[in-house]
């Protein structure tokens, strides 16, 4: 995507208890890190450096692209941090709003106050750095009709499903608590949305 002029901007949601309430045996759980991520990963390091502030993460990443002479005018935002659907709704909405806000004021010397998610998304249509997509990650068993409506409201354009395996006996051994039938149902709901 980068060679076609689209910057991929990976950002992390904050590492609170609600980043994922499940206890899959293989999932890393480092202190002060979102569940399933380790501090050595580049996106995690950037997020921690910016205290998991959404806007600061975006500004840091886009600035690094611009500093190397790469175009910095449009990007796909990849939202990491565990199970998006497990975050509190008000925090998720604020985080999604701040994506657009950060991109809208990226090149402004003085940063204005934040507006609503819908207002920021509308302004972004003519901003110097346009958001062309938002990718979130979640578990297949968290997909519901209501959750898809929430994704639409948040301007989510792509959903990465954490499909860890398709053999239910293995899923049970690793304490996944999300089985093949859940995956099929979640994929079907997303496909038909």
Listing of model-derived features with the role each one plays in the protein:
Residues 1-23, 31-59, 63-65, 70-71, ...:
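N-terminal [4Fe-4S]-dependent radical SAM core
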Residues 28:
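Cys/His-coordinated zinc-binding microdomains
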Residues 39-57, 77, 81-193:
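Conserved non-cysteine loop/helix-boundary elements of the Radical SAM core domain that shape
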